[in-house]
Amino acid sequence: MRKGRGLAMPEICRHLVRMDAQRKKPVLVVLSGAGISRESGLKTFRDSDGLWEGYNVMEVATPEAWAADPELVLEFYNKRRAQLDEVEPNAAHRALADLEDDFDVRIVTQNVDDLHERAGSTQVVHLHGQLRQVRAEDNPGVVESDILTVGGPEVPGPDIAIGDVDDRGVQLRPHVVWFGEAVPMMNKAAATVAQADAVLVVGTSMQVYPAAGLIDIAPSEVPVFMVNPDASAADGYRSRLDSFYALPASEGVPQWAAAIRLRLGH
């Protein structure tokens, strides 16, 4: 009989223990919005009634705007992308990343920045796309990942310009879901929430659909928490909320993280 080349028995046991521990980690689903990024210094449309540094949202963030003036749209998103290099993850982002030591943390974000990833979070679903990615204007399913981080043959720098194309010669556009467009990641987000053992809502009042419907997908026995400095953000959800933290994200999320560790035994 030939001796197997697999793991020795003690190693197999340790491997199975690790797999079992990983499988049993409670699933924490975080629904994050603009408020958590605002605390890092990023501008949001809500800061000034639909304006961003003087740009009207309807003139730069719709398919109609792209058709009418693509250069203006690219100028706007190039500026937003550049701002990412001026900010850092805050205490809320870091607290969520630290929870991965003890929990299966899955983030569903409405934000197009990369602050969750830069803080160390490894499972992030971007409902509305990502500023550092581009795609062909004719195909929402084709994404040139990270091309704006390192440059590439069609895009020599961090900005997109008219004439920057994919390998078929099709113009590139920001990989961002504009107002009026479908949300391709919605099904994945819904499946993520359905597996939650606890849900945290932070930096968003969850008033805009389709994202607003995600809370209703969480199993009824699953506790839902919210962190938001605006007490009215809980309106419409108070009967569903286990706890509400009327605090900025950078204060409330670390407090919630400590509480959830105690509650779920980690």
Task: Write out the residue ranges for each language-model feature.
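Conserved catalytic core of sirtuin-type NAD+-dependent deacylases
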Residues: 2-266
